[in-house]
């Protein structure tokens, strides 16, 4: 009954939920039982390293060294240096040699501050020292003073001068563009120096062939012009497959991008080049005529039916396939700038007759008009009234300037009252009597023709116009 009661009590005793309770480690037991002295006999040697195996390794390592063999490493690689075949020496890595130290010489306060870059070289005395002879007395040496200096006259009066110059030429380098005079020539008694000269030499006559080129040779724009004329490329703006759209907005000329998309302040495009646009699935352009436009090509100026037309060719993207290809028609956008009016015929009337103009600088044939002018009486009285006349004088200041003839300018001269008392005697009278404030002699009375001169001032009667 007693054993049954004990077995029943053991069965009723509660068991830990995890099964058998684990024993603490040797390190944990050593920390708690060392001070109390209740440690099991296998805990202290294991923690303190005094087991039999530890003693064998401790005393055996004093006589045998197995450090590089990797015994007990468990890696199987042979340690740090690896396995070495038997009978061979392991490879050794040469150690870098240390650099020799630099000797630093201290500099004192009295030493110079300038350090010489050249090392001081020691003087080596070679040879046997000069022998010394004993002296047994001396002799009296008498000297005399000479006033004439001991100078030798090297130059001679009648000897010739010989000058020789030797030049060395490097055959590997010759610069033909530089003309150098030849070296002086060796002479006897005088110096002869040659000057630079250029000699002519014969050249080879090479026959030249002329290329057979058709067309006008005076207006060739290229070195080898292509015969024939190339037709200008057609723009293809008025084809049957191109839609014609007239644009009224003048912004189409300056900023066509504003008609396709709304203004983007960050966009800085060039309106003269091809413009590319990208739209979302649903969009509304500012101008309905530019719906689905993805490209506007560069502008072109044409003339059609008497007008100047500004044109751009556009590309629509109405449909988009699954592969991303866009399909659309070509559109010709144009804006008429202005009509070309026919040339108007305006009746023009001359302001002055051409027959009354006289050029004072015109060349006159003296042989033909000399006889007629010489027989003309020049001793004639003036009426005293200045008649209006025209004179064309070229005003040139370095370059010829085309002037338009204007209206005549008349100047009334004062009329002398009679009787007139001359201040100088009239007799003997001159062969030629000239009246007027200024005058020009007839070319027939000039002995030598002078070169035509340019005058920068315009001279009129009595007045000078700057």
Swiss-Prot record:
Keyword Zinc belongs to the record: no
Transmembrane segments: none
Molecular function (Gene Ontology), one example: DNA binding
Coiled coil: none
Location(s) in or outside the cell: Virion; Host nucleus; Host early endosome; Host Golgi apparatus
GO biological process: microtubule-dependent intracellular transport of viral material towards nucleus; symbiont entry into host cell; viral penetration into host nucleus
Post-translational events: Highly phosphorylated.
Positions with biased composition (Basic residues): 1-13
Chain ranges for the short sequence motif Nuclear localization signal as given in the UniProt record: 7-24, 447-455
Superkingdom of this protein's organism: Viruses
A Pfam short name: Late_protein_L2
Region described as Disordered: 1-25
Any one cellular-component term (Gene Ontology): viral capsid
Disulfide linkage: 33-39
Protein keywords: Capsid protein, Cytoplasmic inwards viral transport, Disulfide bond, DNA-binding, Host endosome, Host Golgi apparatus, Host nucleus, Host-virus interaction, Late protein, Microtubular inwards viral transport, Phosphoprotein, Viral penetration into host nucleus, Virion, Virus entry into host cell
Family statement: Belongs to the papillomaviridae L2 protein family.
Subunit structure: Interacts with major capsid protein L1. Interacts with E2; this interaction inhibits E2 transcriptional activity but not the DNA replication function E2. Interacts with host GADD45GIP1. Interacts with host HSPA8; this interaction is required for L2 nuclear translocation. Interacts with host importins KPNB2 and KPNB3. Forms a complex with importin alpha2-beta1 heterodimers via interaction with the importin alpha2 adapter. Interacts with host DYNLT1; this interaction is essential for virus intracellular transport during entry.
Function: Minor protein of the capsid that localizes along the inner surface of the virion, within the central cavities beneath the L1 pentamers. Plays a role in capsid stabilization through interaction with the major capsid protein L1. Once the virion enters the host cell, L2 escorts the genomic DNA into the nucleus by promoting escape from the endosomal compartments and traffic through the host Golgi network.
Name of the molecule in the record: Minor capsid protein L2
Natural source organism: Macaca mulata papillomavirus 1
Underlying gene: L2
């Amino acid at each position: 009954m007693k054993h049954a009661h004990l077995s029943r009590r053991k069965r009723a005793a509660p068991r830990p939920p995890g099964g058998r309770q684990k024993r603490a480690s040797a390190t944990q037991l050593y920390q708690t039982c060392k001070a109390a002295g209740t440690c099991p006999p296998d805990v202290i040697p294991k923690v303190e390293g005094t087991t039999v195996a530890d003693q064998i390794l401790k005393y055996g390592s004093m006589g045998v060294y197995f450090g590089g063999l990797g015994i007990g490493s468990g890696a199987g690689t042979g340690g740090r240096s690896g396995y070495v075949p038997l009978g061979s020496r392991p490879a050794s890595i040469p150690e870098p040699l240390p650099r020799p130290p630099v000797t630093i010489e201290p500099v004192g306060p009295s030493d110079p501050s300038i350090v010489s870059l050249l090392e001081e070289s020691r003087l080596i005395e070679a040879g046997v020292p000069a022998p010394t002879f004993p002296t047994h007395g001396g002799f009296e040496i008498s000297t005399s003073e000479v006033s004439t200096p001991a100078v030798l006259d090297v130059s001679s009066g009648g000897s010739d001068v010989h000058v020789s110059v030797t030049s060395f030429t490097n055959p590997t380098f010759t610069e033909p563009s530089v003309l150098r005079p030849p070296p002086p020539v060796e002479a006897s008694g005088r110096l002869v120096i040659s000057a630079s000269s250029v000699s002519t030499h014969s050249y080879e006559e090479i026959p030249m062939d002329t290329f057979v080129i058709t067309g006008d040779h005076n207006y060739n724009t290229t070195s080898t012009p292509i015969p024939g004329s190339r037709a200008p490329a057609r723009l293809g703006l008025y084809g049957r497959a191109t839609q014609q759209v007239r644009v009224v907005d003048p912004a189409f000329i300056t900023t066509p991008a504003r008609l396709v998309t709304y203004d983007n302040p960050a966009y800085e495009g060039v309106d003269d080049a091809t413009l590319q646009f990208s739209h979302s699935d649903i969009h509304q352009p500012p101008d309905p005529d530019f719906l689905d436009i993805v490209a506007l090509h560069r502008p072109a100026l044409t003339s059609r039916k008497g007008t100047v037309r500004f044109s751009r060719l556009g590309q629509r993207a109405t449909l988009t396939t699954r592969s991303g290809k866009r399909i659309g028609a070509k559109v010709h956008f144009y804006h008429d700038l202005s009509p070309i009016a026919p040339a108007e015929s305006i009746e023009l009337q001359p302001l002055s007759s051409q027959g009354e103009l006289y050029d004072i600088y015109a060349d006159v044939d003296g042989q033909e008009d000399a006889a007629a002018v010489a027989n003309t009486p020049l001793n004639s009285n003036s009426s005293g009234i200045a008649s209006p006349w025209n004179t064309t004088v070229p005003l040139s200041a370095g370059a010829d300037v085309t002037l338009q003839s204007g209206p005549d300018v008349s100047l009334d001269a004062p009329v002398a009252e009679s009787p007139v008392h001359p201040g100088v005697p009239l007799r003997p009278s001159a062969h030629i009597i000239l009246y007027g404030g200024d005058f020009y002699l007839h070319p027939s009375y000039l002995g030598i023709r002078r070169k035509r001169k340019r005058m920068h001032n315009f001279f009129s009667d009595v007045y000078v116009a700057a």
